[in-house]
C-alpha cells in the first residue's frame, strides 16, 4: 500500500540485534501515520527499519509511504505487523486536521 499520510508521532530510534545487518544491529523506530481527511481517518502504527529509521519527521509532516502488512501467529494469537518499506517527506507542506 503506497499513499500519502500525515505524521502524528515518531518514537526515538533504537538499535536491535539483526543477523542480516552489517555489524549485527539494525536501527528501528515506530511511527504513527494517519490518512488525510480528518481525525477519524484510518491511522497506522508502523515500524521503520534500517537507515530510514534515522530520518526524523515532525508532527503534521506530509509523507508518501509504502507500507507492508503481514500477520504471524504466536501462542495461539494472531498479530499484525506493519513495516514501512519506503517513506519520503513531501517538502514544504503541512496538513492541519480539524479536531
Predicted regions and their residues:
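Single-stranded nucleic acid-binding surfaces, predominantly the OB-fold ssDNA-binding core
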Residues: 1-99
Amino acid at each position: 500500500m503506497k499513499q500519502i499520510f500525515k505524521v502524528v508521532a515518531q518514537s526515538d530510534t533504537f538499535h536491535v540485534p539483526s543477523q542480516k545487518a552489517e555489524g549485527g544491529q539494525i536501527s528501528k523506530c515506530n511511527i504513527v501515520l494517519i490518512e488525510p481527511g480528518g481525525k477519524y481517518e484510518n491511522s497506522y502504527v508502523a515500524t521503520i527499519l534500517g537507515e530510514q529509521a534515522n530520518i526524523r519527521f515532525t508532527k503534521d509532516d506530509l509523507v508518501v509511504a509504502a507500507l507492508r502488512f503481514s500477520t504471524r501467529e504466536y501462542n495461539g494469537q494472531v498479530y499484525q505487523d506493519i513495516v514501512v518499506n519506503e517513506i519520503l517527506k513531501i517538502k514544504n507542506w503541512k496538513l492541519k486536521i480539524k479536531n
